[in-house]
């Protein structure tokens, strides 16, 4: 029999339900979590035994949105869901980051978390629901996991923090922050903000962590009622004698190697030391495992770097804790791009471009939460050559998608609205060298490239990555961390913003016990670093260029009567197609009558504007126009009078005498003066050649052939 166990609790303005025991009973654990009609089904499967020779923790997190959750059928030929979207990839990373550090050291059994969105309320984002579900499922599973975690979204509306704001509330919020953590400590922060202060950001993190305690309490209560027995897993016993022998051979040599400031030289020397140490030990005892020796050497490396930092000694590359690496900033480095910059910080370098397009270049995104159009695109590429390696080149990986999204958040707060700057903007960051914080280099490069392109950004923005080394109560916060310091440290803390405040904050903590004081120190130290970088950037370019690139399309905006839109478009789009071909421009028309003409040549744009004005001009009764015969019928002729307008000249209005045959007087393509007699309710125009020639005698009236006149 199915015996579901359910927990219900109020979480901010929403009701959350946790249910287990109903579905997927062959999985290690399964939970259905719902928050006001948004429901996510989360399963966990863990392997009881690790694969032989496994030397890393194979945790996989899959997040998938089913279109039936929103009452939709997928598009595409096959009408079913395909590869994960960018949004799904970002949420999978959001779930992964706070749970990964909570598995014990040495646990290498394969674990897979699958979160499936099965129902969605457009006002409640599934990401927080999925994070709660993953935490609950892992806690119920019995797998060694030092959770549970809670998760919360924090908004900032009318100077007040708001817990789990709805999608509608987020539109007026100056902050969108997701925080996850255990009962004791914050583990992850992901946010974008409208240039808030350090204190406001820290307050949001603390608020979110306090509010999510109710989630942790309810998961713990559910585990007491329905949790599986904890696995009897023990880490492998530490071979103290072997550790001591490896340390004796390698520790002092590794300590010397980590005084080499050049990354490639240091890596080469470290590789030599490791290879020689392993070779020596295996020669002494053939039963030793090279992978195990590699892990011991890695632990020694970590200890060497950390102990030096904690002792106040210079860092790996010789810097003090709050020193930024040398900066080189250049703009306009690529001649034909609309905007470009090369930003170099030590051994990290980003070549960033900005491209301007029209509204039709914007990305149409069809999500479960509804359709939207994105007119600011940010793409981050991390080729293998940036770290001196070979590798696959192809579609972006999870890391590239995540870093691109973070960099975009860093710049978003200073971007103009589509009304202020009616262009689609695409920024691409090519990481050409990498040794720490390429995403923050992308923020700096993007700010420079946008200014170089003439995009009216509100301010320059810069980003910096901070690190942390902590042992007991002793801690050191590091500015502008290297790749090694990120890997061997306890925290990765990225902050982007302008001189006025923070635009993006991302934090990943690998240990418990990060206090509010440590976060405060890190934020303040990051501010000093950010202002230093902005000072250097401003020497290269301190304001957006006054004009956009000569190679960028110039968008001219005019307004027409919405009733005239159909005239500009024409039947089946015939008029607008002809206009774009004739003028060499791109023309977009909005429902309110706003017309945007994009052209790289100003004369072409003016030509298009004149033609549109002709088409939309009101026909004046009694006015004389120059027309061209477009069609001849038995009862008269149709004459085009410019602007796509056409009227009928009845046979009785061709000449001041009786006309038997229209073709005796008019030919196709013939230019004639016409007077507007009437425009009826349906917009049909009556014209007269006879009255036009009477009014303007200089205009020759059409005559019958000479033979006819002589009769």
From Swiss-Prot:
Subcellular location: Cytoplasm
GO BP annotations listed: mRNA catabolic process; RNA processing
Keyword flag tRNA processing: no
Main location group: cytoplasm
E.C. number: 2.7.7.8
Domain KH: from-to ranges: 553-612
Chemical reaction(s) catalysed: RNA(n+1) + phosphate = RNA(n) + a ribonucleoside 5'-diphosphate
Binding residue positions for Mg(2+): 486, 492
Cofactor or coenzyme needed: Mg(2+)
InterPro entries: ExoRNase_PH_dom1, ExoRNase_PH_dom2, ExoRNase_PH_dom2_sf, KH_dom, KH_dom_type_1, KH_dom_type_1_sf, NA-bd_OB-fold, PNPase
Low complexity composition bias: residue spans: 694-711
Region span, Disordered: 689-711
GO cellular component, one term: cytosol
Highest taxon listed in the record's lineage: Bacteria
Cross-referenced NCBIfam families: polynuc_phos, PRK11824.1
Name under which the protein is recorded: Polyribonucleotide nucleotidyltransferase
Organism name: Klebsiella pneumoniae subsp. pneumoniae (strain ATCC 700721 / MGH 78578)
Gene name as annotated: pnp
